[in-house]
Amino acid sequence: LVLFLGLVSLSICEEEKRETEEEENDQEEDDKSEEKRFLSLLPSIVSGAVSLAKKLG
């Protein structure tokens, strides 16, 4: 559970960093691709959390 929360926190920090860079560059196409990339990471994070929860069960 701690690992899962750490991964979520790290993902949120990385996403905020990406958003800041995108605003500075003001490139709309880059914004869309970064959002898709972040969303594509969510299934892995959830899968890892479920696996960890089963082990700790």
From Swiss-Prot:
Leucine amide: modified positions: 56
Entry's localization field: Secreted
Keyword Secreted among UniProt keywords: yes
Any matching Pfam family: FSAP_sig_propep
Bias-annotated ranges (Acidic residues): 21-32
Keyword set, alphabetical order: Amidation, Amphibian defense peptide, Antibiotic, Antimicrobial, Cleavage on pair of basic residues, Secreted, Signal
Secreted found in the keyword field: yes
Stretch forming the signal peptide: 1-13
Coiled coil: none
Disordered: annotated span: 16-35
InterPro entries: Frog_antimicrobial_propeptide
Gene Ontology biological process terms, A to Z: defense response to bacterium
Positions of the propeptide segment: 14-35
Tissue distribution of the protein: Expressed by the skin glands.
Family statement drawn from the similarity comment of this UniProt entry: Belongs to the frog skin active peptide (FSAP) family. Phylloseptin subfamily.
Entry function: Has antibacterial activity against the Gram-positive bacterium M.luteus ATCC 49732 (MIC=1.3 uM). Does not inhibit the growth of the fungus C.albicans.
Protein name as catalogued: Phylloseptin-Az4
Organism: Pithecopus azureus (Orange-legged monkey tree frog)
This protein's encoding gene: psn12
